[in-house]
């Protein structure tokens, strides 16, 4: 392993912010969130029109913090391309094309564009992404559903689930590739994956209406009722999609996606808030059980992660329901910046291969 200090810039674009981090090897020297006002974003017709502004604000932030623009690797949150295996990918023309013109448009698609534009300004600087949400290693039978013109897609919190798996494996003194794990990422969306020897062989689609409902997403809905709603004339296609992802789950039931507010309402005696949150927890527990079946019951551990794993109300009730399957371990938070930096550093040290996107 080289003793040279490796400098890494990490970029994680969100809908109203860009999270930025600078690492010197494993040590974070800057973690910053660049916020954008609604008025500032309203002038742009789409997320790609925001690219120059986001790039310039990032450079201004680095300068203001006294961080030299000198990096060995720039790694960004990956976009919604076609399905690919897990790993670290070099940003190339094919990735830039597919993120700009792909069917699924999301602000995460611009991350690789920012990374590529900045890396071009530096000699021998790598532009990378790692474990994007569309990582697909599902079993062939897991893709099928009851209509041949439709199929189950793999859209999940791959980056944090895999980083949490590696973290747990390191604590246990084993390799991620030697474990069978069920991992539940619980944030604005919820995905639960069955990880068999380093590959996620089954996971719910946390974006498009599959699995438990979450703070912002509806999860699996009764199909016939959904069809009737689509043809009722009350909502447009975009409005229906928003009711599935963005305005579903706790937002639809309780008017908020903030679980802290929901817990405060429960503490104050709000029976409806308790029922709805308990129903969400119940759905997550059922999905954990289903993923244990995908692993034929051979589960070494169940890992709870994401922002909601900070809430003892949620984790304690999940533990009650699923601890008969395997020991439950809690790793709160998303840690996406750290996970991206760890992937970049592993590449720079020659410990992880760089995959080619095609």
Located regions from the model:
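Glycine-rich phosphate-binding loops at beta-strand->alpha-helix junctions
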Residues: 299-318
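Phosphate/pyrophosphate-binding loops at sites that engage ATP/ADP/AMP, CoA/4′-phosphopantetheine
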Residues: 58-73, 171-174, 288-300
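Adenine-nucleotide phosphate-binding core of ATP-dependent small-molecule kinases
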Residues: 242-296
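Short beta-strand-loop/turn "lid" adjacent to the catalytic site in phosphate-handling enzymes
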Residues: 62-108, 126, 134-145
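Glycine-rich phosphate-binding loop plus the immediately following alpha-helix
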Residues: 110-117, 144, 149-181, 189, ...
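Short glycine-aspartate micro-motif
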Residues: 7-11, 71-75, 181-185
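Conserved phosphate-binding/catalytic loops in two-lobed NTP-binding clefts
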Residues: 312, 316-342
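Short glycine-rich, Thr/Ser-proximal phosphate-binding strand/loop in the N-terminal lobe
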Residues: 8-49
């Amino acid at each position: 392993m080289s003793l040279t200090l490796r400098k890494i810039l990490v970029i994680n674009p969100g809908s109203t912010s860009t999270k930025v981090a600078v690492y010197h090897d494993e040590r974070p020297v800057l973690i910053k969130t660049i916020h954008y006002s609604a008025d500032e974003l309203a002038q742009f017709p789409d997320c790609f029109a925001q690219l120059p502004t986001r790039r310039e604000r990032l450079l201004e932030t680095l300068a203001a913090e006294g961080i030299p623009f000198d990096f060995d690797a720039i790694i960004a949150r990956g976009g919604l391309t076609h399905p690919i295996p897990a790993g670290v990918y070099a940003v190339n023309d094919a990735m830039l094309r597919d993120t700009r013109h792909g069917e699924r448009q999301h602000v995460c698609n611009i991350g690789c564009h920012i990374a590529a534009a900045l890396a071009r300004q530096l000699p021998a600087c790598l532009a990378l992404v790692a474990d994007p949400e569309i990582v697909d290693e599902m079993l062939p039978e897991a893709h099928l559903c009851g209509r041949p013109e439709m199929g189950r897609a793999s859209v999940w919190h791959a980056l944090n689930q895999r980083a949490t798996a590696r973290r747990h494996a390191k604590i246990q003194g084993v390799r991620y590739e030697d474990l069978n794990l069920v991992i539940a990422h619980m944030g604005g969306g919820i995905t639960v994956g069955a990880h068999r020897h380093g590959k996620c062989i089954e996971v719910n689609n946390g974006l498009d209406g599959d699995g438990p409902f979450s703070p912002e997403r509806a999860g699996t809905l009764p199909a016939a009722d959904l069809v009737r709603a689509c043809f009722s004339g009350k909502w447009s296609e975009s409005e229906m999609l928003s009711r599935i992802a963005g305005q579903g789950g706790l937002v639809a039931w309780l008017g908020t996606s903030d679980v802290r507010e929901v817990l405060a309402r429960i503490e104050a005696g709000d029976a409806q808030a308790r029922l709805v949150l308990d129903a969400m927890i119940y759905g997550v527990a059922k999905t954990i059980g289903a993923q244990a079946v995908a692993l034929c019951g051979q589960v070494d551990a169940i890992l709870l992660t994401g922002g909601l794993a900070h809430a003892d109300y949620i984790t304690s009730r999940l533990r009650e329901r699923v601890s008969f399957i395997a020991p439950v371990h809690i790793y709160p938070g998303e840690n996406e910046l750290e996970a991206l930096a760890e992937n970049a550093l592993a590449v720079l040290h020659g410990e992880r291969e760089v995959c080619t996107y095609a």
